[in-house]
Structures are given as structure tokens and as C-alpha cells.
């Protein structure tokens, strides 16, 4: 796992905090933040209409943050989601989403694996 410098980590945490506020306005209930497994981390786990949403938050100013979600990152997320579900509720319906924060604006991309 890569270690982030404090400034980068603080920026990421701030983006995640803002993302939670945005998601709440869309009717999401925050379940958990920064869930870790041996495979990686899920930034936000939220519930909406009975579906768990595993949300990767990416922020950036001088580039399109969606490109930071690589196929390798998705594989790690899926393994981490399996760990979460095995511990909490293996029968939950779920989807994987990305929340892009760029220049103070939010864009929620749902079901990014399809």
C-alpha cells in the first residue's frame, strides 16, 4: 500500500468529507468511511434505496480525476468489497461508484464497472 504525504492525505480527507455532504443531499446514508482490507481501501460505503454503494472519491484540479481509477484499482476495490460483504452482509445488493471532485464541483458516476 502506498503511503501519502500529509498534505496529499489532508486534501484527500477534505474531498471525502465534502463528498459525504454531497451524497447526503442525494439521499445517501453514510455507512462507513475508509474501510481497509489486506487488498485496499474503500473511501465511502453508503446506502440508498436498499443498495450498498462502494464509492471511490477522486479529486484533482489540473487533470481529469477519473483516470486515477485504473483497472488495477478496480480489481483491488472488488477484493476489498468481497471482504466487507463477507464480514457484514454477504447477500447485499451493491454497486461501485466514483465521485469526482474537480474545481469545487461534484460528479457521481454510478456502476463504473459496467
Swiss-Prot record:
InterPro entries: Restrct_endonuc-II-like, tRNA_endonuc-like_dom_sf, UPF0102_YraN-like. This is UPF0102 protein jhp_0762. It comes from Helicobacter pylori (strain J99 / ATCC 700824). GO terms for molecular function: nucleic acid binding. The lineage of its organism: Bacteria, Pseudomonadati, Campylobacterota, Epsilonproteobacteria, Campylobacterales. Gene3D superfamilies: 3.40.1350.10. It holds the Pfam family UPF0102. SUPFAM superfamilies: Restriction endonuclease-like. Belongs to the UPF0102 family.
Amino acid at each position: 500500500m502506498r503511503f501519502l504525504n500529509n498534505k496529499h492525505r489532508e486534501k484527500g480527507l477534505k474531498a471525502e468529507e465534502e463528498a459525504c455532504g454531497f451524497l447526503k443531499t442525494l439521499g445517501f446514508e453514510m455507512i462507513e468511511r475508509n474501510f481497509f482490507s489486506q487488498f485496499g481501501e474503500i473511501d465511502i460505503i453508503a446506502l440508498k434505496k436498499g443498495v450498498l454503494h462502494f464509492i471511490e472519491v477522486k479529486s484533482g484540479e489540473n487533470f481529469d480525476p477519473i483516470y486515477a481509477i485504473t483497472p488495477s484499482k478496480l480489481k483491488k476495490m472488488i477484493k476489498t468489497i468481497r471482504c466487507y460483504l463477507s464480514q457484514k452482509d454477504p447477500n447485499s445488493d451493491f454497486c461501485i461508484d466514483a465521485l469526482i471532485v474537480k474545481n469545487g464541483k461534484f460528479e457521481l458516476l454510478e456502476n463504473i464497472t459496467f
